């Protein structure tokens, strides 16, 4: 009887851990810029510390104020299928990162479970 309870407990634990891991589609990731123009980091899974988010927001704000670049940073546990770079291009295109007249957008996507970071740059930053 005790072994049966132990096995059931283990199965419940593994099921709850699996349920916590979330794979995002591009349209599911919260765009923090819509709620607060001084925020540039979307960190729905809490991968980055609050201090890191605050520092990145500060640097991104300075880049935007100087009209150097408009930056968006996303850190998630995993994405739903596909290539990370293609996902990043789709995500940051949907969000409209960068000014159209100078194409100065920079999107940075960190996908923890795949151990990948992808940078998507507008043509104005490449030259």
Show the residue positions of the predicted features.
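Folded, non-transmembrane soluble domains that reside on the lumenal/extracytoplasmic side of membranes
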Residues: 22-127
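Hydrophobic h-region of N-terminal signal peptides that target proteins for export
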Residues: 8-20
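Bacterial N-terminal signal peptides that target proteins for export
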Residues: 1-7
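Helix-centric, low-specificity signal for extended rod-like, repetitive segments
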Residues: 1, 13-15, 105
């Amino acid at each position: 009887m005790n072994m049966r309870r132990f096995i059931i407990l283990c199965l419940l634990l593994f099921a709850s851990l699996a349920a916590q891991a979330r794979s995002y589609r591009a349209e599911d990731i919260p765009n923090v810029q819509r709620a607060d123009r001084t925020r540039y980091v979307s960190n729905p899974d809490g991968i980055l510390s609050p201090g890191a988010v605050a520092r990145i927001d500060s640097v991104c704000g300075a880049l935007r104020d100087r009209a150097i670049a408009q930056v968006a940073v996303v850190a998630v546990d995993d994405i739903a299928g596909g290539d990370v770079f293609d996902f990043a291009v789709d995500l940051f295109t949907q969000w409209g990162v960068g000014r159209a007249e100078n194409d100065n957008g920079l999107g940075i996507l960190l996908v923890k479970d795949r151990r990948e970071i992808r940078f998507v740059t507008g043509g104005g930053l490449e030259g």
